[in-house]
């Protein structure tokens, strides 16, 4: 299996799917989006068509097109493009996995099906194995997010012996606040053979202390630069500085959570900070209110998080 020599590590932006005001995918801005992540945020890995990308609100055809555009625009700019291929049925997941391999993606990830749910570890692994087999040469990651799937199988239980059953398994995106479960995953990963990517942005420093090898999150789209500074401080064993960065990031996330924070609000914040129009979410999600956007902007300013191109004196400039 021709897996990349460099493991997936560091920050991975869970990308937004840009849309027009009438709900169609806005493909022309994806190239600009890639450049913004790399040049302004220092983020060179992406996770496409996940929760933040509204992957499960897109048609299979749209998911294929979105994946193709990110791979095309990211060529020679991004380090790794991981495509989420999870779906509610096996055949669609297999189709998307095979397509990801055909277009040159660097890896695939799969969420647990959440209508008809796996009742135990063996059933879930059987599903994951069949998806992975559709693209055996691609690194395979399990996307663990029990708060949305309702699948309560612990990640540390799943990891036990998984590579014997799924040879392409390379790690997991752990989007849960259960640090005991995550710590046990790290404890199993003695030889660091797996990428253990933490997915709760406001708890990242805690996960780094436990041994996270990287992170996948929505805030790295617009707070990647600040989070990278936290990673650098942590690597240099400057815990005081790392804590300072984490607390500032937490202040913002805590504030917007209290206002009501999700995919819709992430789109509004990314539009505000980057100047790239992300558009509204797709129904049933509702567009973020102007009040939310104004409050989020004020908080970003108070934390000095708005010093990015595309903004001038706090006001968004038109983007070409």
Swiss-Prot record:
Location of this chain's protein in the cell: Cytoplasm
Disulfide bonds: none
Keywords: Carbohydrate metabolism, Cytoplasm, Lyase, Schiff base
Pathways involved: Amino-sugar metabolism; N-acetylneuraminate degradation
Sites where the protein binds aceneuramate: 51-52, 175, 199, 201-202, 218
E.C. number(s) listed in UniProt: 4.1.3.3
Gene Ontology CC terms: cytoplasm
Keyword rRNA-binding recorded: no
Active site: 143 (proton donor), 173 (schiff-base intermediate with substrate)
GO terms for biological process, alphabetical: N-acetylneuraminate catabolic process
InterPro entries the record matches: Aldolase_TIM, DapA-like
GO molecular function terms noted in the UniProt entry: identical protein binding; N-acetylneuraminate lyase activity
SUPFAM superfamilies in UniProt: Aldolase
Enzyme's top EC category: lyase
Pfam family, one: DHDPS
Catalytic activity: aceneuramate = aldehydo-N-acetyl-D-mannosamine + pyruvate
Task of the protein: Catalyzes the cleavage of N-acetylneuraminic acid (sialic acid) to form pyruvate and N-acetylmannosamine via a Schiff base intermediate. It prevents sialic acids from being recycled and returning to the cell surface. Involved in the N-glycolylneuraminic acid (Neu5Gc) degradation pathway.
Subunit structure: Homotetramer.
Family under the similarity heading: Belongs to the DapA family. NanA subfamily.
Protein name: N-acetylneuraminate lyase
């Amino acid at each position: 299996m021709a897996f990349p020599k460099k493991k997936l590590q560091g920050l991975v932006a869970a990308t937004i799917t840009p849309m027009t005001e009438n709900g169609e995918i806005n493909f022309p801005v994806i190239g600009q989006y890639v450049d913004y992540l790399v040049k302004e945020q220092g983020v060179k890995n992406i996770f496409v068509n996940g929760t933040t990308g509204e992957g499960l609100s897109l048609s299979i055809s749209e998911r294929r097109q979105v994946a193709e555009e990110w791979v095309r625009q990211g060529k020679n700019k991004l380090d790794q493009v991981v495509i989420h291929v999870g779906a509610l049925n096996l055949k669609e997941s297999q189709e998307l996995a095979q397509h990801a391999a055909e277009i040159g993606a660097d890896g695939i990830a799969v969420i647990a099906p959440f209508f008809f749910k796996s009742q135990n570890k063996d059933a879930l692994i059987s599903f994951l194995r069949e998806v992975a087999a559709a693209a055996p040469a691609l690194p395979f990651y399990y996307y663990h997010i029990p708060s949305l799937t309702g699948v309560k199988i612990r990640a540390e239980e799943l990891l036990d012996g998984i590579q014997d059953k799924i040879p392409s398994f390379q790690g997991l995106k752990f989007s849960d606040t259960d640090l005991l479960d995550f710590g046990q995953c790290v404890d199993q990963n003695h030889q660091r053979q797996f990428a253990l990517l933490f997915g709760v942005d406001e708890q990242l420093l805690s996960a780094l202390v436990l041994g996270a090898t990287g992170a996948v999150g929505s805030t790295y789209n617009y707070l990647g630069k600040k989070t990278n500074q936290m990673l650098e401080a942590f690597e240099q064993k400057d815990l005081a500085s790392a804590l300072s960065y984490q607390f500032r990031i937490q202040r913002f996330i805590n504030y917007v959570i209290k206002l009501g924070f999700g995919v819709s609000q992430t789109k509004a914040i990314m539009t505000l900070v980057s100047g790239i129009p992300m558009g509204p979410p797709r129904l049933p999600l509702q567009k973020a209110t102007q009040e939310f956007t104004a409050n989020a902007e004020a908080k970003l300013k108070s934390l000095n998080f708005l010093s990015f191109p595309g903004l001038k004196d706090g006001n968004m400039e038109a983007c070409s």
